[in-house]
């Protein structure tokens, strides 16, 4: 297919127009007084949001060269979202500022490669300053502050800090849509997996339709159990001990299942059977997790163990087990804390090494189930449109909170970036590299400038006042006052601020060094074909 090619200034200007189209759509959402953007959806109601990456993902431009610029800045937002989970609007604003200032200098005759080197050195210096001045996050109040600033809602901040307190920093916190109007937190203690009882005859509480086993033994195997003879020896030992039993197996069917139900109905013996969670290798790993948590052994031929030779000390134990139609929860397993700790460390290592997002998510779920539990934030709202908008804000706040726990917090409201610009004074560079540093220095003011503009203030005046104030003193757009940002609870995660700058500078520096754009020539056949079709319809009308 034939291509169209543009060079030099024409190419860079086309990219800049695309960058501006996307960035202008996103930057209006920045800060506590930022506005929302409405995104049209082909199916269902439009989506109202102030989430930078969600807006960026929707933008496609008609002109192929302008679209290249928009897609490059979209990469800044998505990469920041992947790494830090928040700060996507800040990253977009920074990228636009670096590109705008950089292109001015390139047009004036500066060497783009020299500017690129200067930008890289400046970013390195600023990132070092952010890391040095980051404060570790310890208290529940600090966690609530980070979440509140990200979500723009104090109630959400409290909800997330409660969730983190209950399940720990390694715990899983999921966000779901609720059926009612209230947003609430539900915490699942212990290990839960999505497999329920194999027969309703196994329930012990008919009102709640669930089976509750107190201080039971747990038989864990990866085999199918069909014949009662396979498990009879261990059943007899459990009955003699006067205890209840939970069986977790690949499947239990036929004679074995019928016998267990019959004994339950006669009141001889209480046993609940559930299928093993997961599939394939993941199932084996989850069964091992359950065994370690409960102090049992997985009866598997991989270890040379057979069901008929199972002894009572191979069974796991727990304080209580709750089994519903859909899920099983093991509360307070009797496993050794040292074994659980070792298993947690092994899973953490796997999380660091894996390259698959899906595997990482599943490993984090396993880690949470071993380390603390799972918290579910159920998002309620009056309408579906409001619920989706709220859910996006909570997901961002959650990501920001995790980032804060990881690398600490810095002054919020764009203040940390303005303060970090002072670190650039120590860089003694010359020529175009010095210009690159000046470009970054100007770009670092842009988030604060935009927050002030969105709040109805003159950005340049606000930036000047903050620059001349002490470190950590910034502009609170909500109260319209200048104050110590950390003391006022206006904080950003250091990881979010750092990632936003690094990703913005990376894409912007590459874009400045662009000299040529190549794209397919847009096809004109589609319009001609449509016109021909219309003519045919007219001919048919004459025949009627």
UniProtKB/Swiss-Prot annotation:
GO terms for biological process: protein refolding. It comes from the Bacteria. InterPro entries: Chaperonin_Cpn60_CS, Cpn60/GroEL, Cpn60/GroEL/TCP-1, GroEL-like_apical_dom_sf, GROEL-like_equatorial_sf, TCP-1-like_intermed_sf. Keywords: ATP-binding, Chaperone, Cytoplasm, Isomerase, Nucleotide-binding. ATP binds at residues 29-32, 86-90, 413, 476-478, 492. SUPFAM superfamilies: GroEL apical domain-like, GroEL equatorial domain-like, GroEL-intermediate domain like. It is found in: Cytoplasm. GO terms for molecular function: ATP binding; ATP-dependent protein folding chaperone; isomerase activity; unfolded protein binding. CDD domains: GroEL. Pfam families: Cpn60_TCP1. It is an enzyme of class 5 (isomerase). Its EC number is 5.6.1.7. It catalyses: ATP + H2O + a folded polypeptide = ADP + phosphate + an unfolded polypeptide. Forms a cylinder of 14 subunits composed of two heptameric rings stacked back-to-back. Interacts with the co-chaperonin GroES. Together with its co-chaperonin GroES, plays an essential role in assisting protein folding. The GroEL-GroES system forms a nano-cage that allows encapsulation of the non-native substrate proteins and provides a physical environment optimized to promote and accelerate protein folding. This is Chaperonin GroEL. The lineage of its organism: Bacteria, Bacillati, Bacillota, Clostridia, Eubacteriales.
